[in-house]
Design a protein with these regions (language model features):
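Aromatic- and Gly/Pro-enriched helix-to-coil junctions and flexible linker segments
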Residues: 19-118
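Sec-dependent bacterial lipoprotein signal peptides
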Residues: 1-19
Length: 118
């Protein structure tokens, strides 16, 4: 009986641990030097700053991502990265679309880590 109980506890613990998100993953940005104009603007313009979303007179959630300055500000405070990584406590973005590719998320993360150069 004790073996069965121990086995059940171990299985439950493994299931719980496998369901947790690792939000503190480190991205290796060695040799990656994205800039806003070359790398980030195309991502934002295709996935975020589109009609009805984060652009225009009334951008979604009051967050305009249509210019370098606005994207930099939102990125440096963590909002953009949390949303595109689908972290808990943040709205998963882009809304009603597939999650951005790992490559695009890595570009954004490395861009932020390097100070968000234009």
């Amino acid at each position: 009986m004790n073996r069965l109980f121990s086995a059940v506890i171990i299985v439950i613990m493994m299931v719980i641990m496998s369901c947790s998100k690792d939000e503190a993953t480190n991205v290796d940005c060695t040799g990656v030097a994205p800039t806003y104009i070359k790398d980030i603007a195309p991502i934002m313009n295709l996935s975020c700053a589109v009609s009805g979303c984060h652009t225009g007179i009334f951008p979604a959630d009051g967050l305009d991502l249509s210019t370098y300055i606005k994207v930099k500000s939102a990125s440096l405070n963590g909002k953009v990265l949390q949303s595109i990584k689908h972290q808990s406590g943040a709205k998963a973005m882009p809304r009603d679309a597939a999650k951005l590719s790992v490559d695009k998320i890595t570009k954004v993360e490395c861009w932020i880590q390097s100070g968000a150069p234009e």
